[in-house]
Amino acid sequence: MSAVASSAPSATTSSVMTSEVSVCNKALRYLGAPEIVALDQPSREADLCARYYAEARDELLECHHWNFATRYTSLAPLAAVPPFGFAWAYRLPGDCLRVRRLRDSQPFEVVEARTLYTDAAPAEAVLTVRVTDPARFPALFVEALARRLAAALAVPLMNSTRLEQSMLQRFGDALDAARVADAAEGASDPVELNPWLTAR
């Protein structure tokens, strides 16, 4: 089996040419697996990358208050009267992954059907949103995403729990570096990791 790559980017590495395929190929190189030219090509590597990429991306976006994925917005009110003693109900945007806070730290609760309950009116929120354009990802975020994707691919593609554990460990290191660099550019809120990020 090919040796697992160990190189990591610097914080200043450009991500201008980053694409979904390039992130997937970075993960495949870490596993010593063949690279792909498209996510819809007829190969097991492409099929598995297409299956796991979006899930890995969204989970990674959720686990930290990334500056590049932050949106400040006024939520749209709903006509429905909320239960649980809250005065107002609001609709969350379709690309919202996590509500970080409301203005003036007003209490809130997020429930099913992408609805937020609160007493605040209007509800001005800080959100983490889904970013689908990889060209917007900082270089260290790309590194963490590739490591996490490599961990997800290790067993179904390479049949190797050893590689999976190695990639999870390196993912943890890459995530720490990405968080530190992101925090240096603005305030961030630490968030508990989703279990999917730390174990299968």
Predicted regions and their residues:
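Internal mixed-charge
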Residues: 11, 15, 22-23, 103-200
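N-terminal start-of-chain detector that recognizes signal peptides
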Residues: 39-41, 96-100, 122
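Short alpha-helical scaffold segments that flank and stabilize functional sites
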Residues: 27-30, 59, 181
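Short, extreme N-terminal leader segments that mark the start of a protein/domain
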Residues: 1-51, 199-200
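Hydrophobic alpha-helical elements and their junctions with loops/disorder across both membrane
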Residues: 31-34, 63, 185
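Polar low-complexity intrinsically disordered regions enriched in Ser/Thr and small residues
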Residues: 35, 88, 186-189
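Divalent metal-cofactor coordination and adjacent catalytic microenvironments
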Residues: 47-115, 137-153, 157
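Short secondary-structure subsegments characteristic of cysteine-rich extracellular domains
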Residues: 42-60, 163-179
